[in-house]
Every structure is written in structure tokens, then in C-alpha cells.
Design a protein with these regions (language model features):
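N-terminal phosphate/diphosphate-binding loop that engages ATP/GTP or pyrophosphate donors
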Residues: 24-69
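P-loop (Walker A) phosphate-binding loop of NTP-binding proteins
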Residues: 10
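Short, surface-exposed amphipathic charged segments that create phosphate/polyanion-binding patches used
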Residues: 44-50, 160-169
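Hydrophobic positions on the alpha1 helix immediately C-terminal to the Walker A/P-loop
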Residues: 18, 22
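Long, low-complexity, compositionally biased intrinsically disordered regions
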Residues: 165-235
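Conserved glycine(s) of the Walker
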Residues: 14
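Helix-adjacent hinge/juxtasegments
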Residues: 54-93
Length: 235
């Protein structure tokens, strides 16, 4: 199911701030965010903070390790320790990661965690570096179960509203899929009994088309997401 949201953008575009605002809306959540660490107004490093409020230094200008990004030395042992605190979750937990970037990707354990989150049935949201890429990141971008959303200073307020709505649509799609009696299939047309009446979806060359207003504006909706997953399960 398309249930993973990746927020990308240039440094200081607001992607981490946006993720932090979104996860505040969820009570049951697992993951971590990365915070700046400053001293006398100067950024000297980054710390990881888990959903439980546990913190550990990820990188610092004064560390001496074999892993370095810009002037920051990365402590892989600290990172792996924090990963062990967020690698287990329940089926209804909301998953989040900030960020999938160069520092974190020094850790093989982090790569395993990313794939575990994305491969789960849980809704997952993560920030993704725009200034760094490697084969692992490019493979993530090619997945067919993600929404890749770019944030800029100009569009972040608009995208915040869109993301909040999209998350509700994904959650609704998951519920629809769990209730197969909602679906009635007739060749290239499908009827879905929704919470607000019946929606008719038609198959076109570019994929499934829905008549709802959200789809007309965004080319995606809970009905299309649900149908794609329903057909995958029942093919």
C-alpha cells in the first residue's frame, strides 16, 4: 500500500520542523528526530531524540571518529544504541524518522531500520536528504509505496495542510481494505462503498481515476489507495 511519506527539501526548508509538527498529532508513535545542538549561538552538533524522550549525541565537532560530514564527526555507536530503542513497534503505531541522510547512513543498522519501517504495514513518515544521495536513497525513491513531497520555504504551509489530509486519507484507505465487502468490481469499473456514499473508479491508461474532489486536485485519494491495495491482495 502507498502509506510511506518522504519529505525532502534543502537544508533549512522546514522539513524537520514540519515532521515534528505532524507527529505531535499522534499518541502511539515510534521513531526519532534529530535536533541541532548549539553552544554560545553556534551549532556544534546534532542529537537524536526518540519518541520516549531519550537523547543521545549523533555528531559533534569535538568527536574523534572515522565518520565525518562537513566538520561534524558522527558517533555510530550512539546512533546504533538509539536505533535499538525504536526498532520494535505495534501494528497501530505511527512510525517516523528524521532524517534519512548522510550521517545516519554510515550505520548499516540504520538502513535495516529504514527498510523495516517502510516494509511494515504501519504508516511511516520520514525526512529525506536532498543534498546527499547514494544507491540506498535512490532505491527508496523508486519504491511504489511512497509519496515523495518536496518542501520549500514558499510552499511549506500549503504542504503541511496537504500532508495532514493525506495522512487521514491513507488511514481511511487502510480501513477500507480491511472491509472487503465495500468493493464491487466490474471489469474496468469499481464501486467502493465509502463513509460518504458510493464512489465509482474507472481504469484508464494512466491508472485508476476517482470522481472525488481530492483526487481531481491531487491525483490521489483514499479510494484509489485502497483499491490498489485491494487488487494486490486479491489478484
Amino acid at each position: 500500500m502507498r502509506k510511506n511519506i518522504l519529505i525532502t527539501g534543502m537544508p533549512r526548508s522546514g522539513k524537520s520542523t514540519l515532521l515534528k509538527k505532524i507527529i505531535q498529532q499522534f499518541d502511539n508513535k515510534v521513531g526519532f528526530v534529530t535536533n541541532e545542538v548549539r553552544k554560545d549561538g553556534e551549532r556544534i552538533g546534532f542529537e537524536i531524540e526518540t519518541n520516549a524522550g531519550e537523547k543521545s549525541m549523533l555528531a559533534n565537532v569535538d568527536f574523534k571518529t572515522n565518520f565525518k560530514v562537513s566538520r561534524y564527526f558522527v558517533d555510530i555507536e550512539n546512533l546504533d544504541l538509539m536505533i535499538s530503542k525504536v526498532e520494535n513497534f505495534e501494528k497501530n503505531d505511527f512510525l517516523f524518522l528524521d532524517e534519512i541522510g548522510q550521517m545516519e547512513l554510515f550505520s548499516e543498522k540504520f538502513k535495516v531500520l529504514v527498510e523495516k519501517y517502510l516494509d511494515s504495514t504501519n504508516i511511516c513518515i520520514a525526512t529525506l536528504s536532498k543534498i546527499y544521495s547514494d544507491e540506498f536513497i535512490e532505491d527508496i525513491k523508486r519504491r511504489n509505496d511512497i509519496f515523495l513531497i518536496e518542501i520549500t520555504e514558499e510552499n511549506r504551509d500549503e504542504k503541511e495542510k496537504y500532508l495532514e489530509t493525506l495522512l487521514r486519507k491513507i488511514a481511511k484507505a487502510k480501513r477500507y481494505v480491511s472491509e472487503p465487502d465495500r468493493f464491487s468490481i466490474n471489469q474496468h469499473e469499481v464501486c467502493i462503498r465509502t463513509d460518504h456514499g458510493t464512489r465509482i473508479l474507472t481504469e484508464q491508461k494512466e491508472g485508476w481515476i476517482c470522481s472525488c474532489e481530492f483526487f481531481k486536485e491531487n491525483k490521489v485519494c483514499s479510494h484509489v489507495i485502497a483499491l490498489e491495495e485491494y487488487l494486490k491482495i486479491h489478484e
